[in-house]
């Protein structure tokens, strides 16, 4: 039973770390990366459609993204959606190809982004700790119902704590890498 709780906690913690990685990819670093545009929705025939369903996005070089729009009639809507996003990008259209130069980040903007990244990481840590709390609560419930011994309960809580420490360290490592990436000029 403790093993099941442990496996469940591990899976939930892995999902939290994955979600954090996903949030970090959306934070612009001044380097062109196709996943930067993943969150953009384009109004297409009256329905909000993910940008990656309407265009092929590639990194032309380290500072330019190139989009090849599949449907020429959607090119203007794609360009407008990119401009209206909160990413601060200014696309240039040439027919069905839209080029997006990545503006260099100012020192102030870098510091703001680092603050945002740290807040996101703290949110990830809190999520992992909440999972630990839930798992420990499940273990205490089993102990209360006399389904496990006190020794088993302590071993289970220790295992959950080790798991928590492992995932918090992963989050800290991801944060350090992102901060380094943001501070590169």
Swiss-Prot record:
For this UniProt record, give its keywords in alphabetical order, as a comma-separated list: Cytoplasm, Protein biosynthesis
Could you tell me where this protein is found in the cell? Cytoplasm
Q: Name one GO biological process term.
A: cytoplasmic translational termination
* Gene Ontology CC annotations of this record: cytosol
Q: Name one GO molecular function term.
A: ribosomal large subunit binding
Pfam families, sorted: RRF (PF01765)
Q: Does the keyword Ribosomal protein apply?
A: no
The UniProt entry, under SUPFAM superfamilies, shows: Ribosome recycling factor, RRF (SSF55194)
Q: Which CDD domains match?
A: RRF
Check the record and name the InterPro entries matching this protein: Ribosome_recyc_fac, Ribosome_recyc_fac_dom, RRF_sf
Q: What does this protein do?
A: Responsible for the release of ribosomes from messenger RNA at the termination of protein biosynthesis. May increase the efficiency of translation by recycling ribosomes from one round of translation to another.
In the record, the note on similarity to other proteins reads: Belongs to the RRF family.
Q: What is this protein called?
A: Ribosome-recycling factor
């Amino acid at each position: 039973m403790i093993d099941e709780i442990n496996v469940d906690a591990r899976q939930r913690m892995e999902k939290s770390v994955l979600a954090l990685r996903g949030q970090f990819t959306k934070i612009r670093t001044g380097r062109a990366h196709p996943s930067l545009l993943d969150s953009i929705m384009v109004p297409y025939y009256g329905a909000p459609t993910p940008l990656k369903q309407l265009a092929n996005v590639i990194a032309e070089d380290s500072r330019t993204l190139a989009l090849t729009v599949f449907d020429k009639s959607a090119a203007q809507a794609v360009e407008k959606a990119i401009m209206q996003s909160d990413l601060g990008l200014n696309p240039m259209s040439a027919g069905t190809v839209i080029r997006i130069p990545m503006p260099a980040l100012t020192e102030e903007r870098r510091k703001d982004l680092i603050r945002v990244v740290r807040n996101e990481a703290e949110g990830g840590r809190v999520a992992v700790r909440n999972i630990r709390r839930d798992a420990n609560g499940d273990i205490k419930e089993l102990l209360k119902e006399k389904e496990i011994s006190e020794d088993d309960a302590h071993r289970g809580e220790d295992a959950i704590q080790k798991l928590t420490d492992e995932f918090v360290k992963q989050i800290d490592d991801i944060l350090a890498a992102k901060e380094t990436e943001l501070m590169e000029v």
